[in-house]
Amino acid sequence: MSKLSFRARALDATKPLPIFRGNDMPDLNDCVSINRAVPQMPTGMEKEEESEHHLQRAISAQQVFREKKECMVIPVPEAESNVHYYSRLYKGEFKQPKQFIHITPFNLDYEQPDYDMDSEDETLLNRLNRKMEIKPLQFEIMIDRLEKASSNQLVSLQEAKLLLNEDDYLIKSVYDYWVRKRKNCRGPCLIPQVKQEKRDGSTNNDPYVAFRRRTEKMQTRKNRKNDEASYEKMLKLRREFSRAITILEMIKRREKTKRELLHLTLEVVEKRYNLGDFGGEILNEIKIPKADKEIYAIPPSLHNGNHHKVPECKVKNTHHLNVKDEVLEIVRLKKKYPKKPKADILVTPLPQANSEPLAVINRSDIKQYDFQSSDDDEFPQVPSPLSELEEENDPDGSYAFRRRAGCQYYAPHLDQMNDTPETTDLSGLARHRNRHCLTTLTVPRRCIGFARKRLGRGGRVIMDRLSTEHDSVLKQIDPEMLSGFSSSSHIAQPPSSPSRTNASDRHCENRLSLPEILSNIKSCRLQCFQPRLLHTQDSDREECTSRLGQAVNLKRVSSSLLNTSKNGITVTGGITEEQFQTHQQQLVQMQKQQLAQLQQKQQSQQSLQQSHPKAQGSGSSDCMSKTLDSASALFAASAVVNSPAPVRSEVNKDQNAGHSNLNGVVQPSGTAKTLYSTNMALSSSPGISTVQLVRTVGHPTTNHLIPTLCTSNPQTLTMGNSCLANTVHLNNVSVVSPVNVHLNTRTSAPSPTALKLATVAASMDRVPKVTPSSAMSSIARENHEPERLGLNGITDTTVAMEVT
């Protein structure tokens, strides 16, 4: 505290001054209450420091004795100096350093440890150096790591091995020494540390208040006495005023919005009055919301390989409401186009994600008096109900077809559409085209299983494969074995009615075993497709391609007649390979004779027609009876017996000559044709000598033949519940093939006419001549009727022949 003092003021003449005599001088204690006394100034110390005992005693002694007493001072510890002890610790070899402040360079030097060795550590280090070399710095680093890793609890030996990258013996020796020294040490740590107080000033360990740590306080202006509490109050008041200003601005904006809404409502009423919309029809038309696109949770997979670039669609919460701005004007409604029904039933739409579309509120859905007023600020406003979305659920999603403005669209061609087998309104060739059959490829030569052919964009041929349980076995089948089956099959005719379903097809393709599938191929109940090869072997065949077709068909007829039956029917007798080769040579020689006669008599053909006018009318009908000689008739009569194994190799040779076929028929486009049972009438002109080959069916429970004969008169051949179809005319040979024959009744015995075939054929001793006109008519007839040529295959029937 400072002593009492007076402030110098100007004397006032109006106020009397007190006059004291020397003996009447008042004491010091009486002068304390004088009003002119200057208030005590702050000493610059805290209250605790001012009340400290030594400080108060020193101040009081100075005031009383008017001088400084040596005994009345703050005690300070004396500094003792022992020169001898100092000289013993620090030698007199001191050198003045060049600089006292050292700056650590910015390098990767290892940090020096905080632990310093003592004499006890040197003793241990000397003992360890006898067995291994260890430096003092290395020892200090080890002790320093152990000290810093331990707090109140010491680290274990295993943890010390992880901290110290040294030898196990050295680590164990240093660890044991460190633990023993740590326990003997009175302090908490072996490394001396400077005592540090807390920064908040809460430590009161120092007895002298003057040396305690000060707390950081906020500096305020002393003249206005703004302490920390008043400053905080001012900050709070500022925040409250800022909040009030923000609320006032929001209220101002709300009132402006309500005023604009009122003006817009008045404009809408005026416009409706001018348009005459007193019933609200135009207003309701405008209020119809626009259709929003659906939000899909899973992005559609792109087939261009850039799957890593597809952004993920985030699923939004359904409780959020988006207000969509919509102009309140007359909007033209979007024209809806009718969607065509999809014919493909196999293609099922992908399941949509379980994400509901986001709720959207349009401006037009809000009623004209749905705005808030100033009275109901505390109550939340409930929006008007949402309008119904009239958009249809399109299964195509974002890939749905949408017409663009300025584009002209044409109707699709119905003849180029690829229909699926499941369509019920298909009939004829359209249904036949979708049939799957066993397919063989040429390059590479292998079987790919069940497939169907269709024409793709740009004329490319596309094979649609059908997965079955026999794919692994069918791919291992030798294509040469299927070539023998397909070469003997006949033409598949379209069905008479579209009532036939695919149940039998799926049964034949998916539910049958492999032996049954091969049996169905041989019995013409299942198809086998092979691509056609268009290449010839020599130049002679390129000149007479149409003639070669006739010879090839004759060869296929002869090879089909030699096939055996698989239903247990055996017939005595047979032919050898030499006879078959002889018959083939005779057919080739016959064709060469016909070609030679055509070239020789080409110039004299007109004169022959004038000299024989009657022969022209009957030339086309007489050609059927003048094409077989006696040797060929005998060979055809013996064709009812089983054929040996080498015959199949001959058939394969004919196929490899450049005419691969589908079930024995050369198809122009390679499309497989289904097999159907239809009723066909076998007719021939009366009075014409014909040789007809008729297939007879062998019942699996009988051991005799059931021939079906074809006479010269028109008639319909029926047998049981099936009909004979596919009559093929090869000059004078007619082949009738049964399709899907099922015998439900007991068959009859063979007719006597069939038993006379051999004797009648042997009685033909003369060889009829072949006229050019008859040959030309027969060749022309075959060229114009390629689809009627059918061949017998490896079936469960035998063949009989009648010569009339």
Curated annotation (Swiss-Prot):
Biological processes annotated in GO: chromatin organization; DNA repair; regulation of transcription by RNA polymerase II
Pfam families, per database record: E_Pc_C, EPL1
Polar residues: compositionally biased ranges: 611-624, 654-669
Region (Disordered): 372-395, 484-508, 603-624, 646-669
Compartments in which it is found: Nucleus
Coiled coil residues, start to end: none
Alphabetized UniProt keyword annotations: Chromatin regulator, DNA damage, DNA repair, Nucleus, Transcription, Transcription regulation
GO (cellular component) term, any one: piccolo histone acetyltransferase complex
Function: May play a role in transcription or DNA repair.
UniProt family annotation: Belongs to the enhancer of polycomb family.
Protein name: Enhancer of polycomb homolog 2
Organism of origin: Xenopus laevis (African clawed frog)
Gene for this chain: epc2
